[in-house]
Amino acid sequence: MSVTLALPSKGRLKEKTLAVLEKAGYKVVLPDDDRNYRARVEGEDDLDILFLSASEIARELGYGSVDLGVTGEDLVRETLAHADERVAIEAQLGFGHADVVVAVPEVWRDVTTMADLDDVAADFRQRHGRRLRIATKYWRLTQQFFSQKHGIQVYRIVESLGATEGAPAAGSADMIVDITSTGSTLRANRLKVLEDGIILRSQACLVSARRSHTSRRVEEIAARIRAGLEI
């Protein structure tokens, strides 16, 4: 039975993933046609490569329609409810680093922690007659972090369809939850990360579907990739 490994379809994630695989001894033979999203691995007839977007990879792993995939941990945990029951993180690959963070306007000088934010959320309801608005593409991670971890209930998530960091200045939200690598975009938009506002430190990971996790072939591929990372 063949194993399907889903890889990022473009950009630096694709390049770095192919380099990790080659280091582990898996040379991916790319198709001549860029519109062909399947590839093969030299000498590995039972290993099929499928190129998808990083978010699609997380979703297909959750469905169990691919056995292994390389995608960001943030996408896995945002896309899949009860992610640890549906997939397993086999290895952190050391690239694609980014943090999912809680950021508020710099002018909120007295707000530096999630506890401060809890007070602000309650005050917003009293002063403005509405809930604190949070712009984000990460609604699941936001709900878990605010409601379950910090007990903050008085807020409303505003779905972000564009540049999330611009939402407070545009007036469509009061603050944001977003992903950042260097923080420069947040600073450019006069936003600051709360001291305890890092929701997740994410990076590219090798992930297996739980239904495939105990497969000897999947275990062998994952072990070989982990060994390659140590070289």
From Swiss-Prot:
Transmembrane stretches, start-end: none
Assigned keywords, A-Z: Amino-acid biosynthesis, ATP-binding, Cytoplasm, Glycosyltransferase, Histidine biosynthesis, Nucleotide-binding, Transferase
Annotated catalysed reactions: 1-(5-phospho-beta-D-ribosyl)-ATP + diphosphate = 5-phospho-alpha-D-ribose 1-diphosphate + ATP
Biological pathway: Amino-acid biosynthesis; L-histidine biosynthesis; L-histidine from 5-phospho-alpha-D-ribose 1-diphosphate: step 1/9
GO cellular component, one term: cytoplasm
Keyword Transferase: yes
Superkingdom of the organism of origin: Bacteria
Documented EC number(s): 2.4.2.17
Keyword Transcription regulation: no
CDD domains assigned to the protein according to its UniProt record, in alphabetical order: PBP2_HisGL3 (cd13593)
GO molecular function ontology, one term from the record: ATP binding
Protein's cellular compartments: Cytoplasm
Chief location of this protein within or outside the cell: cytoplasm
One of the GO biological process terms: L-histidine biosynthetic process
NCBIfam families: hisG
Complexes and interactors: Heteromultimer composed of HisG and HisZ subunits.
Free-text comment on this protein's domains from its UniProt entry: Lacks the C-terminal regulatory region which is replaced by HisZ.
Family according to the record: Belongs to the ATP phosphoribosyltransferase family. Short subfamily.
Function: Catalyzes the condensation of ATP and 5-phosphoribose 1-diphosphate to form N'-(5'-phosphoribosyl)-ATP (PR-ATP). Has a crucial role in the pathway because the rate of histidine biosynthesis seems to be controlled primarily by regulation of HisG enzymatic activity.
Protein name as catalogued: ATP phosphoribosyltransferase
